[in-house]
Amino acid sequence: MSGPVFVITGGSRGIGEAVALGAARQGYFVVLTYASNAERAASVVERIHASGGNAVAVQADTAEEADIQRVFTEADRHGRLGVLVYNSGVTGQHSTLIDADTSTIDRVLDVNLRGAILCGREAARRLSTRTGGAGGAIVFISSRAAFYGSPGEFVWYAASKGGMDSLTNGLARELGAEGVRVNAVSPGPIVTEMHRPGKLEVGAKRSPMQRAGTPDEVAATVLFLASSEASYVTGANLVVSGGL
């Protein structure tokens, strides 16, 4: 018998994949979203099923409200929502702001911030004791870029993550008395497909630990925040960056 439903957006690779696998091991019914790679998402679901867990994959563009509604409708089919982890994120092409095109900026803000807000709203509607929910947890995957600003690379991405940090803080205060904890995790250089060639190595050398992190190390932090072990933790932003 599966436990509560665990929604993880961007759950087909990297940090999202590690979170999905870990949540399934903890007994959650996992609803993971993917943008376009159905084969990769199916592979994650198959691994969960092979280990005795339960999961489904849903194609969704989290910049689209209709897709978000469809994800949560699917989650409702499988039981009571317990956790949302918003992991969807894009950077756009690297450049200075002077050279950036508006379509890139719009896309990054729509996926990284607007999508987080809309998914947070849908989760809150289901989790809040004020609306009949049983409480639960929301975890937003932010970035150390929000602190450093990513000059010369993608300041718009950093700004979108800064907005996510504000969302975390405000929503934690808004939902604190309604049984919902809201936190964020800010990864530093992590071994994922998001980084352009050479970028990860540069970040690893800057880290006091002299290495990049792994998706599993980030996932462990996410799963802690989603668990009862973090029952008195809300409004926090845990940095997983090797000291950066």
Model-found features: residue ranges?
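Conserved glycine-rich Rossmann-like NAD(P)H-binding loop of the short-chain dehydrogenase/reductase
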Residues: Q26-S43
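Conserved glycine-rich cofactor-binding loop
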Residues: S12-G14
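C-terminal substrate-recognition "lid" of short-chain dehydrogenase/reductases
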Residues: T214-V240
